[in-house]
Amino acid sequence: MEADPKVPFTDEMNIQDEHNWESGSWSSSRRSNDSNVTLLSRRSSVEQHEDERQKDSDTLFEHGDAALDAQGIADPRLKDYPIPLVAQTVHLRNDDSEPILTFRVWLLSTFWVLAGCSISTVYYFKPFSVRLSGYVVQLCTWKMGQLLASALPTRPFTVLGRRWTLNPGRWSAKEHALVVIAYWGSSYTAYGLGPLSAMELFYGKRLSSPWAITFLVTTQLTGYGLVGLYRHILVRPPSMYYPGILPTVSLFNAMHGDPRQTASSLRVFMAIASAAFVYQWLPSFVFPLLSSLPLLCWVGRGSWEAFVLGSGSLGFGLMDFSLDWNYVAFLSPLFTPLWANANRFVGAALAVWITYPVAYFSDALGSLRFPPMSSETFDTSGGLYNVSRIMTPSLELNQTALELYSTPRWSFSYAMHFFWGFASASAIVTYAVLFHGRTILKALANVWSLDGNTADDIDSEKDPYVKLTSHHARVPQAWYALLLAVCLCLGTIQLYAGDMQLPWWGLQLVVAISALFTLPCGMLFATANVQIGMDYVSEVLAGALFPGRPVAVLTATVYGRQVLEQCLNLASDLKLGFYMKIPEWELLVAQVYGTLLGPFVNWAVMRLIIDTQGAAALLGREGGDGKGQGLGLGQGGGGGGGGGGGGGQQQRAAGAHTTEWNALKTKNFFSSSVIWGVMGPARVFGGGDGSPSSSSPYRWLLPSGFAVGAAAVLLLWLIHKARPAWRVQQWPLHPAIIFHGASLFPVFPTTNLTSSMAAAVASMGVMRRWHPRWFARWNYLLGAGLDCGAQLVQMVLGLAFLVFNRHGQQMVRMPHWWGNDAVAVDQCFPPPDLPSVIMSPM
């Protein structure tokens, strides 16, 4: 990471501005520029600024790392900043003459949203996922912006009385950041596309385009309205710093700083990204054995117990290591705080390496009938659950068939996945109430009294970054409230116009509960880079409220999940804009634009695929009956910047199997609607009237999960009250994160765990503590480069599979050899006495 340490933090602030910053008084006339008019009138000031910057650079270029103190902080004004990671990364420079919402921003953001949404939607209906990496977009946009700055005409023109220019000058960091933020708004396929495709392909319910797009837009934008309510808690305080965006800030610094100071940073980043790109071909395609090195399985070869304990793909992954960055990056080890990853690791290790093996070998809940680490849904005989056997031709529940067949069964590990999920949900709310309740209530009580243009927020009065941008016009609370109200009104109208089976009060209730969870989840995400979502709660809640209405369950689940996630996405992007000194109005416009444009592309591409390919091609020979489909809840690769656990596995699977159309995600949504909507939580977790689930083995999961989560936090709080001198709040211990870490498996392969935690200790532990200068200069660039190179390989492989592996052909396929064994790619061969059920698909 490099935050331009050799440049003084006054090189882009004139002396009067620095004096005003010190005194805390800013002229009300200093407003952020919102058009290119200001830019045209400031040509001379920009040129003068460049001259001053050049003189400062000439003076300081010789000093190198001498500008960094022992903690890697360059500016003495930030030496006491409460978050050293931010002080090391985010500079105190701001140039209000830099262009912001320019023609180049609109052009490039439109291009990347169209390209990214089209690619992600096409692969939504493929057996593996591919999306444009955020780092790839950031890198390409940098050069494209520079090209436009040199090619577009600079002649001004007048439109509706306002002077404009296509080219206001050099490509600025603020423009660059806005393009990336707009792309982030739609970088993933809209979550609501799954229910829409499931409704059409399985339930024969096709929505008209206007109402379908309304559904996608409202599910994506409703959460943005909550940001106005929570931004004074989730964005403004310095303690809410969002660790996941610091690598992006570091890369922006390297791209837009003085070339003589950042040239070395860019060279290092490009070298790392290139090396990662070359190396990643080995574990992803040529030598996949590198992805999983199951030492215990190799040592105990021939023993089925050693196979179960040591396999990282089918078993518990004990002593399994990985040299695949897609797996190593699972915990985002180079920028997630070490204490947070330690909590996740403890929870995962206690679950995967202690609880699950003991329960499995003791046959708890009939574990030996099912694979040890599987997220599929089974029947009582151990076969994959066939939902078509319990459905009538009209896709309603056949109670008699259910009693004759089976209620759903899970592996012990997947049953505990729900237990840990319920525990983490209750723990995070309880923690926020007990430890931060007064602060939250005070902030919420004053939220409407805080003017949109003031910086007097909680814990931010003395924040130098706040003071630096306090003159920027901020979005009033009323605008966020208006956005929320419009989305709720349109969403309610769409429910009835589209016959979504969800009553108006159901939408309001789901949004209200999601809003309740958003604040504690957001506080954790902003400080620990750990996001606990509404997946578990929204599905169970919707199934309990609307039994027998699968479409209503799908609709409520989407709103419950997306309101929370989109609120946190915008809060994170607002913090990025805050670090990049982008006014809130401009950032909100860019974010909403990208998010609005995405659903139109998602729906258009989905319509093209369904209309041209047909349901039979998308659903395979099963013809849409959902036979053999498991829940698939919570599965998926990680995002840019360090998720991606399992990405290499997905690509290798794609290389070994057909890449024809296969709506796996849609099938998973259909199966979820059957389990939680048609059958309902009462039958799954017990207590259903007259159903065989009255003796369900999982009847204890929900109540005990919520109770354990709340009890763990309550115990911690009681210790805090009984022994104040112990400073419990400063302990690196968070029950919600521990439970969340345990819930990650078996959804993700256990291969991820050991190597990812080792990388976290090396980066955020050893290097940050013992080599802070190196950490401050290179750590985030290292992480960004590794992510960029590895993700680019996955994108290239995915596109190659799409283009060449069609119509049953396997033109892109690595020949089998010792490092790419046809039976066991990790050389963890199943012994002859291995129970056949263990080899069932995960």
UniProtKB/Swiss-Prot annotation:
GO terms for biological process: protein transport. It comes from the Eukaryota. Keywords: Glycoprotein, Membrane, Peptide transport, Protein transport, Transmembrane, Transmembrane helix, Transport, Virulence. The chain crosses the membrane at residues 105-125, 177-197, 210-230, 268-288, 315-335, 345-365, 415-435, 478-498, 505-525, 585-605, 668-688, 700-720, 731-751, 784-804. GO terms for molecular function: oligopeptide transmembrane transporter activity. Residues 1-58, 629-657 are annotated as: Disordered. It is a multi-pass membrane protein. InterPro entries: Oligpept_transpt, OPT. PANTHER family: ISP4 LIKE PROTEIN. This is Oligopeptide transporter phomP2'. It comes from Diaporthe leptostromiformis (Lupinosis disease fungus). The lineage of its organism: Eukaryota, Fungi, Dikarya, Ascomycota, Pezizomycotina.
